[in-house]
Amino acid sequence: MYSDFFNSIAFKWQAEWEKSKVFETNMDYSKPKFFITVPFPYTNSPMHVGHGRTYITADIYARYLRMKGYNVLFPFAFQFTGTPVLAIADSIRRGEVDVIEFFKNVYEVPQDKIKELEDPYKLAEYFKEEMKNTAKSIGMSIDWRRTFTTTDPRFEKFIHWQLGKLKELGYLVTEDDVVGYCPNDGFPVGMHDTRGDIEPEITTMNVIMFEGSDSYNFMVATSRPELIFGVVALMVNHDANYVVVEYEGKNFIISEKAYKKLSFQKNMKLVKTITTSDIVKLYAINPITGRKLEIIKNKYVDPSLGTGVVMSYPAHDPFHYLAMTETNKEFEVIPVVETEELDEIPGESAVLQTKNPYALKDFMESIYKTEYYKGYMKDIILSLVPDFLKQYVKENIVGKQVQEARKNTIELLKSLNIYDTIYEISNGPIYCRCGSEIVPKRIKDQWFIAYDNPKWKASALKAINNIELIPNPTKTELEKIVFNARKEPIGRSRGIGVKLPWDESQIVESLSDSTLYTLLYTVIYKMPINIEKEIFDFIFLGKGDAKELERKYGTDLIQLREEFLYWYPVDQRHTGRDLIQNHIPFYIYNHLAIFGEKYLPKRIVINGFVRVGGRKMSKSLRNIYTLSKAIKEFGVDPVRIALTSTSDLLQDLDFNENLVNPIAEQLKKIYDLIDRLLSINTEIKELRTADEWISSKVRDIIEKVNNNITSFKYRDAVNLLLYEIYEILRDYFDLVEIPNQEVIRKILSIWIRALAPFVPHIAEELWHKISSTFVSLEKYPEPNELNLYPDAILEISYINKIIENVRELEDIVHKKAEKVIIYINESEKVKELMKNAIKAVNEEIPLREFTANTEDKIAEKVYVVVSKLDKAIRDYLLNNEIDEEQIIVKNMNFLLRRLGVSEIVIYNAEDPTVPDVKGKKSQALPLSPAIVVE
């Protein structure tokens, strides 16, 4: 709607800022320093509105503190590391039409550039420049001298230095472990290697070996091994492919999908395929009870989960019960767990209520949880097992809680050599960026960062208490993640990035090289290109001979050391909520390892997600909303507000035109209003009530805005700045025929400066109508720039309350008033009661206690009235008398004009001679007159 208007102004001032080097920051001991950072972005795509939310949230705070007199450093860098860039380049090289069309239509990459992006380094460089331009376009106040990429040779040496330190400390280890793995690319994966940025979560499943007929065996995965006693059949999927594999000298039947997955975990050999028609001709033997089990096929078995073979316990699983009924054969049900909450055969009870698969899943999960936490193993189990097992079963399983019985059942299965475990991706399916499904794989001699090291983990948990986390609820979430931290693989066999110095076949993965890079912001712009690790020992740890190193590198290392010591630690780290799962804990861990608690970030600010069309942004949903597109459509400053100030910090927001357009309209109205008011030229010198009132109101708003910004309540701050001040100015011009030029000019100066962190371009344009300086470097307004006039606030608030009450009465009677009758109550008795109520409110005496100490019937109503007043007004009323009638008379013309009535009559409610219209006299209270409309 106004995008051209906003953008022309924005690009004009961005050029001026860059020309004047406004945001280039150097050491300055005369000011308090503030070092603020955001995560550097992957350069495999343009910036989207999700990036924008985090980055602009940080920029607003950086701009605010700069105007508060801080020496603010806000740097930026770019991450080329990892598989995202490589995966996209590979897709383009393969000619994948959907990727290429997405690049052209959504990312707006020119056709003649597509071919060039087959080279991953050129792709990364292309999007680096695009991102840098977008960051500038959105108004980020960055010191661009300090930028770098993760392919910078200085960054490579830095990572070698960092990993060397971790290795010396014993935090880098090699061992065998199970990790999420891409079969196609041949390396372990983490969150940033997967489509949708999903961290693979690996869980263990129990496996029980069943002997079968014709020399076949069945490998059965289960989450409920204790129900082996009640198994009446085995189940396979009715139309999936199955295979026979050789494992530990025996032939086992599993699904083909399971084999493809388990071959990365187990030493299995494919023997042959087998049809489900042949499988159901076989039978199996329950290894605990000796019962002969039929093999049945149905649609309820997931061939991709576990082994694709399921043991059927219909008494306790509604899907199993339903599957058995669909065979149209008689079957036995053996309940082996009992609870007070569930029926004896909960699987049957669920099916009798519904056969809807979604509803049955809820029943299944409820049964599982109830039996696990509240269930006991039934005595009947003892009669189901052979004699040689009876003693163990009696002592360790019968009558035991399910939680204990499960452990003991597993021990029994192990002793019979029929137990095994497999690994599953519990939050799968998850796909690598190359398109392959991620599988669990046991990796031999893999390098890991030992985030599960007990001493290191304990230090990290302790450190969290010394870091301010905003909003506070994220602290518990972070503590839980650190508590559950496990080893993380450090290397990848392919991708872009730094090679492990002791194993050049491995490339350091993207989460492992993004934990300490904020150190580099302090010095990289003054560092020579050709350096060795020893330079970092001196700059960051103070180790080494400065003069010898200076001769070697030709650089003033003492100055670099001083700059590091000046800026570090990071005062405020901004990030999106997704990175609390990995980057933030890793960031804390690595700082602790090398520096102890000395250089931990002082504060971490975490914001929620941005959704488009009500859903998370995803290439598959084709709802990626690039930041450059948003700027073109709506304009820079409206987008800044929309992304940061329309929801609470941790709350997700849905970005769309209905969100941004009203903001753009209001900003344009504000611009036009200020532009018009700046041209006002009047001779009014006296300070009238209306002038005192608007000064007091704006003073109060500025105090609230300052508090809101420092507590990251941007939405509240913006509501005050965009709407409250605007409405107050409108009310002011209703109150006065001729404005006070000096007062208005002062308020406009304050308003423009207050807006500057949020909408810096509009603010800069307006500011230059009254000054030649940059508003970005001006002083942020303080409340004490304006005086407080409680009597003026009280007077105008009183008048506005009358107007509000009249409007409400008109709505009730559905009629426009022609005459207004106002009853006021100013008796000495009521005034004294009001002062007593004010004292009670100020002393935080509860209403019940206050009314208990007085017999006055209106005490409660008076208490409620004064409790709604600001403290400054309450304090004023304690020491000053007000004349309500005089206030109304003084503002009579304004009231008549605003209400559009022909007559306003004022009555003293204590005067027995005045009429009691509609019985309203008795309802008049101090500061709360009774009103009648006719």
Curated annotation (Swiss-Prot):
A biological-process GO annotation: leucyl-tRNA aminoacylation
GO CC terms on record?
cytoplasm
* Gene3D superfamilies for this protein: Class I aminoacyl-tRNA synthetases (RS) (3.30.2320.20), HUPs (3.40.50.620), Isoleucyl-tRNA Synthetase, Domain 1 (1.10.730.10), leucyl-tRNA synthetase (1.10.10.720), Valyl/Leucyl/Isoleucyl-tRNA synthetase, editing domain (3.90.740.10)
The UniProt catalytic activity note for this protein reads: tRNA(Leu) + L-leucine + ATP = L-leucyl-tRNA(Leu) + AMP + diphosphate
Enzyme class, broadest EC rank: ligase
InterPro entries registered for this protein in UniProt: aa-tRNA-synth_Ia, Leu-tRNA-lgase_arc, Leu-tRNA-synth_Ia_arc/euk, M/V/L/I-tRNA-synth_anticd-bd, Rossmann-like_a/b/a_fold, tRNAsynth_Ia_anticodon-bd, Val/Leu/Ile-tRNA-synth_edit
Q: Name one Pfam family in it.
A: Anticodon_1
GO molecular function terms noted in the UniProt entry? aminoacyl-tRNA deacylase activity; ATP binding; leucine-tRNA ligase activity
Annotated compartments: Cytoplasm
Sequence motif: 'HIGH' region, positions: 41-51
The record's HAMAP family line, in alphabetical order, gives: Leu_tRNA_synth_A
What is the name attached to this protein's record? Leucine--tRNA ligase 1
Name its species.
Answer: Saccharolobus solfataricus (strain ATCC 35092 / DSM 1617 / JCM 11322 / P2) (Sulfolobus solfataricus)
Gene that specifies this protein? leuS1
